[in-house]
Amino acid sequence: AEDGIRDLVRSRGLGDVYKRQGIGEIKNKLWDPLKRAFADLEIRNNIVIGGAYKDKIFVSFVSHLTGTFINQWLGVPPTNKTIYLRTCHCHQITNNKIIKSYILIDTVDFIRQAGYWPIHKSLGAEGMWPAPITGDGENNSNLDKELSMKSLHQSLTMQISLGTKPEMEPTFSTDNIRYNLINDHEQKKYWHPKMMWFGPSGVGTARGLKGFVDHHQLPFRLTFKERDYNTIGHYVEIGDGNYSMTGGWHSIKSKYGSNHWLGFEPNNVMVEMRVMDFYLHHEGLIRENWVPIDIAYILKQIGVDIFELIHKK
């Protein structure tokens, strides 16, 4: 595998735990501890897509690292049971070699599977993310550039619509905001009636626009009212057939202003969010959206160390 990785490769993931440069450091600090903890580790890909953005080539994945948890990892004691590490990763390719990787492993979901839950109950449903309903996420070989561009355009246009903020209307109650987001907001025209929104552990999964608004979007908007989606921007925006993907490291920076999202008391700390969005475009609309967010890193920024909480239990 090292033949496909340049010496200057950079890997970013798990908050600042694994912000590493060079093959040796990535091997010693990321992969070796993983392989010690999960000796039979293997990867299962649900989505594989690629494309170009700003003259850079990217390949992105929604995967699960699967193995038997036999030795501690990140200070969490082993269970000797199967663990599925939800892993979303995006790699920049130059001359057929990886020069930079962005890796989000859902450590909160890992903690949940290990039998711990030291934070507030998720609003959405917890559980393993399924593969795309169309069954073609890993075997997507559509080279139709027009379709790829159409998919990316749809997801980016939907994201732009999120900049409309009914929560900033001084006369709007929470019920008014909720009604607007479900019934009147521009986003409605982009989402499939049977949409699925697969969120990170700590937030959970939601079905339909109503579920999405109730279990993630409205609480998120009430907590981060001053968020700005556009100033920082993305490091990647790609379309590949009926799929598209965007990512920011970080792409959003805002104050943690209420306890609606994640449940912790507001402290107005400025929070950075590292996030990816993977989209399935089906029947002319966005059917499914997989959204890895580094929740452990967000919690750490507001003064909540989820790994310390485990040891206090």
Model segments located where?
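Single conserved hydrophobic/aromatic residue that forms the stacking wall/gate
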Residues: 1-18
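A beta-strand edge to alpha-helix "cap/lid" segment located at domain peripheries
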Residues: 48-147, 221, 234-313
